[in-house]
């Protein structure tokens, strides 16, 4: 009934395993064969007609010998046959034989079997000959009163189609259907009848709706959906009707059908901007997300909530629903949780942040009690980051959050613990009043930390922010506890010597004799020569890291000990205590150096770590004021500067987002008076039903269409030359998951070209959906052929092929014109995206495909080259603008993008300007691209190479 329902296809499976039969054999089967033979013959006739055969001699045979049969399969096949068979003479007059067929239609419309009646009515919807339909009108009208709903609903469809195409055949159709609708009880029949009134006589549809508006909630969901559509269209065209129908939309929010609730909520938002309407719609969306089990539905509805939030006035209403939105976190799907947390974070305000933090704390504790799973770890990370953001925006909440989160520093999941550590580092720097609490909790969990990266970070925080003698002593105590007895080498050797003795006293069990390859006997000891693992488990954490050969943590330990020792010297007045503390710190460093150079660790200490520890020993032995300032002031100043820059960037990005959302009102814009406000509001909105229909049909307007200077002609690809007998050019229309080729084919000859076929093939991750149908081109005629290509991933695809045709009257072989290749631009599938530095590094380490592109350009400015690459690749620069600003001879930047298929693409730009070659020297260097798939890495590299060459020329 809508634009999408105007076309109805019947799909027929064609087998190519046999030769096409002759007309004589088909005629014999149709005349004298059994039911089965007639069925097969009729199928073959249908396929041959679809392939372009005329078969005029079989029409009367089928009317005489097949049409009278009552077999249901044959009746179904006959409906297909009558649909495709030519019904007119070359001059457009109806064939005489069709009068007999018309009588058969009439009998089928009066058949006692409801299926035959209903399917015949459906078939009549496809007829385009009014002469055939006119004698059938009384029988079609009578079907409206049939006892079976299948017949009645198809009768409504038939009447609507006939009224739309040939109004003179049934001029009273709207009145007839209105009367039918008033008395009808079946939901599907009422839906079809109401749908017809919407399109044929909207006033009658509104009159009917007005009479039963209070009973709408009792209707079936299919009728409710149509009512929602009608109300939307009426109010969109005539805003003054909103007050009349908005209560009905409110009632439909309580429908038992999720589809009706979803459509009603969307309609309510477009019809009214009142806070009560927005709140009701948002509440409906939230209930749908919670109750629906399909994660795709949850994500779609979440997107609608996010769209609501983009409107400044709606955002204030949604802020009161943050706690309801958090109920969605009961969904186990990570993507749903991620979107929910982001939405809640965007909406949180000082009024509800406390409640939000309480809920998130409970969720964090829950993740600790759940069986470990990959998604559980990622969810915990999301929660930690959300709490981190809340604490930065609302400092009063930090004191409640920190104790809970710091328990996770001892977590085995390094990623979650690293997020907690980053949060703690920022909190201890920003909030002076929380430092004692953070130090206390850090000292509590310090011994339980299991991963070396987290241990290093915790050491740094303790060394940087312990400012009292008691805290400094506590740090030293924890370090000694974590290191075990010192000197480490002597202690380990003693343990080794002590463990050998009891093993010698153990009575060896009788060992079985084994035969070697050489035929000699060998005995197997019952004692294991490898070190028992329990001893390794019993080692204190820091000693365990050192014995594993990780001496980077030793360098971090040396820096921490230097900081606390210098601070202790400044705080303690007793010279003996000062010397004692410094000596203890130096002893620990010396014993670590000794261990690193011994053969006990799995890996020896590196030269860099030796230099760092030696430097710290020298600083402590000399205690100069300059070194004191560097260790105790400059380090903290660097952190403070980094956090300030990051905060400034976040504020800048938030400002840009808010500017995007705010509707700018120009000084010369017309003023909307009260009487005109509603109309003005509605006029600015597009028809949502039309937009969704276009999206479903793949006709959405892409972003380039928003530019008035942009033209489809920019994407036209010439496929053949002007001197070829057939000229062809294609417009490449890229949708989300498919490509539509709109090919213009022009016959440049004076001959008629028969069976002109566009033959296409693909290279890459592309797949041709269906082969274009052959056509006939008159001399100098033209036609448009459309072909659909399915896209499965972001790779550079190539479409190639040719046009083949026969010349009318010529006896030669088929002619062929080879087409130029069509290269599919992957930029249509790549979108800029953001990720944190930690996520970027993690993906960089995980992705196995790398493509290194050498810079080859004539651009002489580093920033200009970077901007050119960003524009060419559609990627986003993750490196802050401040880090890239200034005049420098080199530049390094990280770029990131995601495809619509969820594929990640990373790039690292490392470029320099060779000073010795002069001011006009071009930029050189390289770009490293990493991706999970080889195709993505290669495609992006090709794109960069092509754009460089274009610039260079």
UniProtKB/Swiss-Prot annotation:
Its main location: cytoplasm. InterPro entries: ARM-like, ARM-type_fold, Clathrin/coatomer_adapt-like_N, Coatomer_bsu_C, COPB1, COPB1_appendage_platform_dom. HEAT repeats lie at residues 96-131, 132-168, 240-276, 277-314, 316-353, 396-433. It comes from the Eukaryota. SUPFAM superfamilies: ARM repeat. Keywords: Cytoplasm, Cytoplasmic vesicle, ER-Golgi transport, Golgi apparatus, Membrane, Protein transport, Repeat, Transport. One of its GO terms (biological process) is somite development. One of its GO terms (molecular function) is structural molecule activity. It is found in: Cytoplasm; Golgi apparatus membrane; Cytoplasmic vesicle, COPI-coated vesicle membrane. Disruption phenotype: From 28 hours post-fertilization (hpf) onward, embryos show an anterior-posterior gradient of pigmentation defects. While the head is fully pigmented, more posterior regions are decreasingly pigmented until midtrunk levels, where pigmentation is not detectable. Melanophores are present at midtrunk levels and migrate correctly, but are not properly pigmented. Embryos show severe reduction in pigmentation and widespread degeneration from 48 hpf onward. Failure to form perinotochordal basement membrane (PBM), without the loss of laminin immunoreactivity. Signal peptide: none annotated. The coatomer is a cytosolic protein complex that binds to dilysine motifs and reversibly associates with Golgi non-clathrin-coated vesicles, which further mediate biosynthetic protein transport from the ER, via the Golgi up to the trans Golgi network. Coatomer complex is required for budding from Golgi membranes, and is essential for the retrograde Golgi-to-ER transport of dilysine-tagged proteins. PANTHER family: COATOMER SUBUNIT BETA (PTHR10635:SF0). Oligomeric complex that consists of at least the alpha, beta, beta', gamma, delta, epsilon and zeta subunits. This is Coatomer subunit beta. It comes from Danio rerio.
